[in-house]
């Protein structure tokens, strides 16, 4: 087959060249020595024709790359590289971020090469308008705002607070209790998010580190992470076997900022070591040797076979291991041998556990975990891919079954916890997990299991927005960024069509008028536990608004797109006058009306890629409930001798767990937050957050006052659904709590005031349902992730994108994906931040 010449070069080097009219050699792309075989750089969206961000004409010319590549005899350079310069717009690409070469190399780029950063035009700062107030928008705004000599940043957000789906507030009518959107925590592999929090804290005059640990200024390590699984017709709590390690969360690997990233290899060695360790525990755990006898009948004794696999992986470097994984089994005797060993071990274990897993909870959970790990290892080797995006057209469980997972393990919580965490539910009743893109799910599973730094998870020391969004606000203000609350994005105006599309204007709805000349102060003045950052209110600070009394009297929710409130006027931002570049950080659910010119087939500005993104990416309504109890954890969770023997943990706390009955499959014990609230003595002794999702493929009505009753109807529906769920299942989750449902209601703590009995005590708790377009969670269903757009691939000049709905390494809804997206959007414009952690598989 005849490949275009540039495609040959790109395939050979596994990287694109960077061309933006001026040739640049990124500081992040330096190879420091022959011992380092990785070539890392930041890749921005290619600009080969048209105009740049400043409106200057661009006529980029890409010359052929001359490379000396030490592949040995395994590969030769393709013939026919062009002797003349290549001038083509076809090299425009969506590829972003870090890339690498796996061999020592010398790359010669003809012409002058110099170190540079993208300069602001016309001797002035570049004006950047950031639309949205969630973690992605704030990350993009922060990394640009701190480059004060180059950028003027203005952020526009709806309502009175930052946070997006991380927003929350203090209920002034309920002892300033924290009422969150849902259950939020940082997982230990959130490297970009934790590192960014550390930098934000520094610039906000706060410290992420303390005497308690490197991130304890904002987070509490969560030692209790587990799952609930149904065994023998009974729900059982299983702590996950993940202890702390000595890696520091958020720390940039040594040398990475100068072009030496950490190895991005799939953790094959960690998987094999975990299998070997678990096998050893299984053999030594029951005092006999039937498993030894099983493996002695195999072609290779299991101990020696597993030891050989682990030793071989440990000997190989990351580059050799990646090359090995990508080699087809037919071309590698070593790979065929490894696959055979894994299959034989799994066959032996299936025989060994056949009866034990039916009678022993421990054996059931142990065998399910081993089967999952063996299947993943076998599947990755057989598929021969390091790019898990290649697997995203298939469902994760279907892929595991295809590679030999036992049928009975398709519903084990070891696997379904990934579905629950990413809200991958079926679109019809009964509630059940379903439809998770395989690559997304496998990547999440491996990062949770093997990729964490320090602890598997971290709870916020205060509420999510107080811990995360307050410092963002403080840091942005410290860097001179303007934050415009009460500005809802309503639409964008596009000029030109096809490759000439450009952003001409942004339409905003001004929701309220701030009194006086000063900026709006978003915080509560008198709510702060010791060391707690300023808190966000549940409603605006009405006394600062001209329309404050009207909004208060009418109960208008400025975060409700169905509210009967027209706002106080319109505002239009024009390119060239109000902004030079715009970053669209609005959630996907709210985009259809905003980017309508790109979606309407009849519009001259229509873009099929945007149509595919919006129409083929499913969204879901998440739900949550917070319960305060007058009883401690020891009175609600089983700590009997039998439970301690089963779990190996006498601590009654549950921490973070998932895998329970839909639609509320996850629980977080958040009791430490009570100390940051203002309850009278005696304070609540237990606080639990419950979260889940309703049916997938949420279809909300269009914004407008015609649907003003919709949010209230949804909230009432969710309260009724939660009541039914809690009545039916409270004994399974609160396994040491009251047996009678009325007694459970009596154990709930309610705010002071009129006496409440029965269900009134439940209704006094906190409930939330995603009933706004911007609240909807973006799913990662099979075949859908390929429609995501990269942060620099909007197809509209002067428009960048930020959000967990964009193309990232994670391709799923989480703060890590949102933060990475914001970082990449900022870097596409400025080449900062210099280092962005990439998963690598």
Stretches found by the model and what they are:
Residues 3-59, 70, 75-80, 84-88, ...:
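C-terminal lid/capping helical subdomain adjacent to the catalytic/cofactor pocket in oxidative enzymes
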Residues 3-128, 146-150, 541-570:
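Extreme N-terminal leader/targeting segments of oxidoreductases
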Residues 140-144, 472, 825:
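Hydrophobic residues within alpha-helices
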Residues 145-170:
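Glycine-rich FAD pyrophosphate-binding loop
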Residues 174-308, 315, 323-351:
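Dinucleotide-binding Rossmann-like beta1-alpha1 core, especially the glycine-rich loop
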Residues 374-377, 383-386, 443-463, 467-474, ...:
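C-terminal segments that line or cap access tunnels to active or ligand-binding sites in enzymes
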């Amino acid at each position: 087959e005849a490949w275009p010449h540039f495609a040959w070069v790109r395939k050979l080097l596994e990287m694109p060249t960077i061309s933006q009219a001026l040739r640049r050699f990124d500081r992040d792309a330096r190879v420091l020595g022959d011992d380092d075989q990785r070539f890392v750089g930041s890749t921005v969206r290619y600009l080969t024709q048209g105009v740049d961000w400043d409106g200057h004409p661009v006529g980029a010319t890409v010359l052929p790359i001359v490379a000396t590549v030490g592949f040995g005899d395994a590969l030769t350079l393709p013939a026919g590289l062009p002797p003349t310069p290549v001038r083509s717009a076809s090299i425009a690409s969506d590829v972003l971020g870090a890339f690498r070469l796996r061999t020592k190399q010398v790359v010669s780029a003809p012409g002058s090469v110099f170190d540079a950063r993208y300069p602001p035009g016309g001797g002035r700062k570049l004006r950047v308008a950031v639309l949205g107030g969630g973690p992605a928008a704030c990350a993009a705004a922060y990394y640009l705002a701190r480059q004060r000599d180059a950028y003027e940043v203005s952020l526009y957000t709806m309502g009175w607070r930052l946070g997006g789906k991380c927003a929350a507030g203090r209920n002034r009518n309920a002892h300033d209790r924290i009422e969150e959107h849902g259950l939020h925590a940082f997982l230990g592999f959130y490297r970009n998010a934790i590192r960014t929090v550390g930098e934000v804290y520094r610039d906000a005059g706060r410290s992420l580190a303390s005497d308690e640990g490197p991130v304890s200024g904002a987070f509490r390590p969560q030692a209790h992470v587990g799952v609930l699984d149904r065994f023998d017709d009974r729900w059982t709590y299983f702590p996950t076997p993940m202890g702390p390690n000595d890696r520091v969360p958020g720390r940039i690997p040594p040398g990475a900022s100068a072009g030496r990233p950490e190895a991005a290899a799939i953790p094959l060695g960690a998987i094999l070591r975990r299998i070997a360790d678990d096998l050893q525990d299984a053999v030594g755990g029951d005092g006999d040797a039937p498993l030894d006898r099983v493996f002695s009948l195999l072609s290779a004794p299991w101990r020696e076979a597993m030891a050989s696999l682990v030793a071989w992986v440990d000997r190989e470097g990351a580059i050799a291991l990646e090359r090995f994984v990508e080699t087809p089994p037919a071309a590698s005797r070593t790979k065929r041998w490894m696959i055979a060993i894994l299959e034989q071990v799994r066959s032996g274990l299936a025989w060994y556990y056949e009866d034990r897993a039916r009678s022993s909870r421990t054996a059931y959970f142990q065998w399910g975990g081993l089967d999952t790990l063996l299947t993943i290892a076998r599947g990755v080797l057989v598929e021969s891919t390091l790019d898990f995006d290649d697997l995203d057209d298939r469902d994760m469980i279907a892929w595991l079954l295809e590679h030999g997972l036992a049928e009975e393990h398709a519903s084990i919580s070891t696997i379904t916890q990934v579905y629950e965490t990413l809200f991958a539910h079926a679109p019809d009743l009964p509630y059940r997990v379903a439809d998770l893109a395989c690559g997304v799910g496998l990547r999440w599973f491996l990062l949770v299991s093997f990729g964490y730094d320090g602890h598997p998870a971290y709870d916020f020391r205060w509420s999510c927005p107080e811990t995360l969004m307050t410092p963002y606000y403080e840091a942005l203000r410290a860097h001179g960024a303007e934050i415009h609350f009460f500005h809802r994005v309503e639409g964008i105006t596009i000029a030109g069509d096809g490759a000439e599309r450009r952003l001409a204007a942004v339409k905003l709805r001004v929701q309220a008028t701030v009194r006086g000349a000063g900026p709006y102060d978003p915080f509560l003045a008198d709510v702060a536990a010791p060391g707690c950052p300023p808190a966000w209110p549940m409603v605006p600070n009405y006394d600062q608004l001209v329309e404050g009394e009207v909004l208060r009297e009418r109960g208008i929710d400025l975060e409700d797109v169905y509210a009967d409130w027209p706002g106080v006027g319109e505002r239009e931002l024009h390119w060239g006058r109000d902004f030079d570049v715009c970053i669209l950080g609005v959630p996907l659910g709210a985009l259809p009306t905003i980017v309508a010119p790109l979606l309407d087939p009849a519009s001259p500005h229509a873009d099929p890629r945007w149509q595919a993104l919006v129409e083929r990416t499913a969204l879901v309504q998440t739900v949550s409930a917070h319960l305060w109890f007058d009883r401690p954890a020891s009175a609600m969770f089983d700590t009997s001798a039998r439970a301690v023997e089963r779990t190996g943990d006498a601590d009654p706390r549950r921490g973070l767990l998932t895998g329970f009955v839909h639609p509320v499959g996850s629980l977080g014990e958040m009791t430490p937050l009570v100390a940051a609230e203002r309850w009278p003595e005696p304070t609540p002794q237990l606080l639990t957050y419950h979260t889940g999702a309703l049916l997938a493929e949420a279809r909300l009505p269009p914004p407008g006052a015609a649907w003003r009753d919709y949010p209230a109807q949804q909230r009432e529906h969710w309260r009724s659904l939660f009541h039914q769920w809690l009545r039916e299942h409270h004994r399974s989750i609160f396994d040491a709590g009251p047996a009678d449902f009325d007694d459970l209601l009596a154990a709930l703590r309610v705010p002071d005031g009129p006496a409440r009995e029965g269900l009134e005590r439940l209704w006094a708790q906190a409930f939330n349902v995603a009933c706004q377009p911007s609240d909807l969670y973006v799913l990662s269903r099979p075949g859908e992730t390929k429609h995501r757009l990269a942060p620099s691939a909007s197809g509209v000049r002067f428009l960048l994108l930020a959000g967990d709905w964009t193309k990232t390494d994670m391709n799923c809804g989480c703060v890590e994906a949102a933060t990475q997206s914001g970082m990449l959007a900022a870097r596409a414009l400025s080449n900062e931040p210099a280092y962005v952690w990439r998963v690598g598989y």
